Swiss-Prot record:
One of its GO terms (biological process) is cell division. Belongs to the Cdt1 family. One of its GO terms (molecular function) is DNA replication origin binding. Pfam families: CDT1_C. This is Cell division cycle protein CDT1. The gene is TAH11. InterPro entries: Cdt1_C (IPR032054), Cdt1_C_WH_dom_sf (IPR038090). It comes from Saccharomyces cerevisiae (strain ATCC 204508 / S288c) (Baker's yeast). Present with 2190 molecules/cell in log phase SD medium. The lineage of its organism: Eukaryota, Fungi, Dikarya, Ascomycota, Saccharomycotina. It is found in: Cytoplasm; Nucleus.
């Protein structure tokens, strides 16, 4: 039974294969391609007649026809470009529309022969793909033998043979047996923007099956060297109007991979909604793929794309912050705003990346009133949702929509500026802090003035002292022994003072235990209560008393009560370190007796 289940699981993850020995003409291939594209974005082609010729040409590329490294890489993203790990990229673009000129031609005979064979096959299947999932008759006729654009890409590595699957580190053991080392491949993400991309050898490539989410970092390796691989691009997915979706591939550049991508002419509009032409979309993809080249030829466009990524990040971060703060407000029984460093781990977990304080302050740059960010008495930043009345909540638009509109307005102002475009949203600088009533702001300069006035009063009182206090007396000669004695005496006094403070602090907590016990006694027994909920409830209940306490003191008092009444109050620690308290019955008389015993032990 388990073997059958495993075989079914493997069949689900298998790439669809078109066997040309079974289907060959267009009438037979069209329904097959349509059925594949409704569920997949990758398929293999088996028993291609010229596959042996392609393999021989690919082998010659690795050993004989080396790329011309002296031609450079121009603003059209054509030529030869050195990459990492001794890998070279060779790329050529061709367009039948005379409005766009790509003057660099491919002079490599083997690469040209590969291009001619891949182009005929790729153009045929590109037309099939468009007819399969694109309903517009005008778009179905946009690709033909006289109207097209192509991009030929080749990766070259001198040591590429060491990374081929079958010949990876092959050697012969003393026994005469063959032994092979398996090298770990280094994959890079590859997202075609055209209608279709064809690979002459389905090897050193990984794809994402349709059963996996786009954000899931799970890939399935393809090792079918006797097949050609076809992968649809983002243009076909956009023109299909939801009938077809595509996802990125992962390729190993060190495996000397060659690919051919096919478009309609690059001046073709993507849609009638003013989204630009195919050339704009291709330029954007090339800028993202080669940022170093774009920094030289298209610095402004590169900055705009990076700023777009930053805007996408802050929009997603705002949505997550809304969720976290709303859940935090529901779980807390007091209106005390949470500290920002307490919220960051949960926000980072939901964002699936590390979020720091400056990332939160970027939201205030877009919308300064999005959140109430203040400094508490401990010097920590607190973050809370702004107060809104019910009428405003019902009549105004959602906060997320309001933030998106403000973000778009801020973005348009930045890119409309003639100055150098920033690549990220700057963090908001907090120059003011709110008063305790949240009704007005107190300038830091006023605070400094107030403190300086207080110092002036202190100085005036000090000047009224006698003259002898300002005269330096002559120091008596001292020895090293007396100095050590004074240091030891100072340490003893410091230790005694610290012990006295700790004792008084414990006495203060013991005094507050009665009030906290009354709060617990008023709650429903037999119910679980988190330490966060109880601490915030205790702080809120005692904030109007003579000696209010904080959440830290409340947690220590709860632990002390559980230590005095271990049979009555139980505590359990769940995943993440959160403590949960529960009690069934509480006796005030018994607690009073045990509390007196606890206080007497502290005095002793």
């Amino acid at each position: 039974m388990s073997g059958t289940a495993n075989s079914r699981r493997k069949e689900v993850l298998r790439v669809p294969v078109i066997d040309l020995n079974r289907v060959s003409d267009e009438e037979q291939l069209l329904p097959v391609v349509r059925a594949i594209l409704l569920q997949h974005d990758t398929f293999l082609l088996k028993n291609y007649a010229n596959k042996a010729v392609l393999d021989a040409l690919l082998a010659g590329l690795t050993t004989k026809d080396l790329p011309d490294t002296s031609q450079g890489f121009d603003a059209n993203f054509t030529g030869t470009l050195p990459l990492e790990d001794d890998v070279w990229l060779e790329q050529y673009i061709f367009d039948t529309d005379p409005q766009l000129r790509f003057d660099r031609k491919c002079r490599n005979e083997s690469l040209c022969s590969i291009y001619s064979r891949l182009f005929k096959l790729g153009l045929f299947f590109a037309q099939l793909c468009v007819k399969s999932v694109v309903s517009s008759a005008e778009l179905q006729d946009c690709i033909s033998t006289s109207h097209y654009a192509t991009k030929l890409t080749r990766y070259f590595n001198d040591n590429g043979s060491t990374h081929d699957g079958a010949d990876a580190g092959a050697t012969v053991l003393p026994t005469g047996d063959d032994f092979q080392y398996l090298f770990e491949r280094d994959y890079v993400t590859f997202l075609p923007t055209g209608v279709l991309t064809i690979f002459p050898c389905a090897k050193a490539i990984r794809y994402k099956p349709s059963t996996m989410a786009t954000t899931d970092n799970s890939w399935v390796s393809i090792d079918e060297p006797d097949c050609l691989l076809f992968h649809t691009g983002t243009l076909l997915a956009r023109w299909s109007q939801g009938m077809h979706t595509t996802s990125p591939l992962q390729i190993d550049p060190r495996a000397n991979i060659v690919s051919l991508t096919i478009w309609p002419p690059l001046t073709t509009p993507i849609s009638s909604k003013g989204e630009g032409t195919i050339a704009n979309h291709l330029l954007e993809q090339q800028i993202k793929a080669f940022p170093k080249v774009a920094q030289q030829y298209y610095p402004r466009e590169l900055s705009i794309l990076r700023l777009q990524d930053a805007m996408k990040f802050v929009k997603e971060l705002f949505t997550v912050c809304e969720t976290v703060l709303s859940l935090n407000a529901l779980s807390r029984s007091t209106g005390v705003p949470p500290e920002l460093h307490v919220l960051l781990p949960q926000i980072s977990s939901m964002m699936k990346r590390k979020i720091v304080q400056d990332d939160i302050l970027k939201l205030l740059t877009i919308w300064s009133d999005a959140y109430v960010v203040e400094l508490n008495s401990r010097g920590e930043l607190t973050m809370n949702l702004p107060k809104r009345d019910n009428l405003t909540t019902l009549t105004n638009k959602s906060r997320t929509l309001a933030f998106v509109e403000r973000a778009e307005s801020w973005y348009q102002q930045v890119i409309a500026s003639k100055d150098e475009i920033m690549t990220d949203v700057p963090a908001f600088k907090i120059n003011k802090r709110r008063s305790s009533s949240n009704s007005k702001t107190v300038l830091s300069s006023k605070v400094q003035t107030k403190s300086s006035n207080a110092n002036a009063l202190n100085n005036s009182r000090y000047l009224a002292n006698s003259k002898e206090n300002f005269m330096y007396k002559e120091k008596m000669p001292d020895s090293q022994a007396n100095l050590m004695d004074r240091l030891r005496e100072r340490e003893r006094r410091s230790a005694a003072l610290l012990s006295q403070r700790q004792k008084r602090y414990q006495q203060f907590l013991a005094m507050k235990m009665t009030q906290v016990f009354d709060i617990l006694f008023s709650l429903t027994r037999g119910q679980p209560y988190t330490e966060t909920y109880l601490s915030s409830l205790i702080v809120d209940s005692l904030q109007d008393s003579n000696n209010p306490i904080g959440t830290k003191e409340a947690s220590e008092i709860l632990a002390g009560l559980q230590g005095i009444l271990p049979m009555d109050i139980s505590v359990h620690q769940v995943d993440g370190g959160l403590k949960v308290y529960r009690w069934n019955s509480l006796d005030k008389n018994r607690f009073s007796k045990l509390l007196q015993i606890h206080k007497s032990k502290q005095q002793d």
